[in-house]
């Protein structure tokens, strides 16, 4: 049983290593590949969670990713941000510009 467990762990480690190496190879190849929808959504969610939401939460608001349709990112502004007169500025400056810088310059953010 121990030998079997070790072999399984080694197989998983080897598979993970191959995946990491392939990712590094693609990243270092200089070729730009278009993001898949899953990758794009994951990156958008990561930027929102790590860079945008903490700022909005500090002001009594929040943002939720609603949908992604091509380069259109639909979000729901919540809390104080939902009724704030500056919500358009928040949408364009705090959210859209950050997503454009981090992911793709052609992204457009819309409130729903």
Curated annotation (Swiss-Prot):
It holds the Pfam family NifU. InterPro entries: FSCA_dom_sf, NIF_FeS_clus_asmbl_NifU_C. GO terms for molecular function: iron ion binding; iron-sulfur cluster binding. One of its GO terms (biological process) is iron-sulfur cluster assembly. Belongs to the NifU family. May be involved in the formation or repair of [Fe-S] clusters present in iron-sulfur proteins. This is Nitrogen fixation protein NifU.
